[in-house]
From Swiss-Prot:
The family this protein is said to belong to: Belongs to the eukaryotic ribosomal protein eS17 family.
Taxonomic lineage of the native organism: Archaea, Methanobacteriati, Methanobacteriota, Methanomada group, Methanobacteria
Any one GO cellular component localisation term in the record: cytosol
Name of this chain's protein: Small ribosomal subunit protein eS17
Gene Ontology biological-process entries: translation
Length: 60
């Protein structure tokens, strides 16, 4: 069983995908850089959660 992602993580990832979807791909490392560049998240843990969820959405 995995961890449940918060609404903030899901909403932020979806918004970033809508605004900057062409910059994201199925590579987690690339998505971490994109999230760091285009969002104002304060912690590395939160950045990684958002990048992971964005990667998950793209792989579906």
């Amino acid at each position: 069983m995995g961890n449940i992602r918060t609404t903030f993580v899901k909403r932020t990832a979806k918004e970033l995908l809508e605004l900057h979807g062409d910059k994201f791909n199925s590579d987690f490392e690339n998505n971490k850089q994109v999230v760091a560049e285009y969002s104002t998240v304060s912690t590395k843990h939160l950045r990684n959660q958002i990048a992971g969820y964005a990667t998950h959405l793209l792989e579906q």
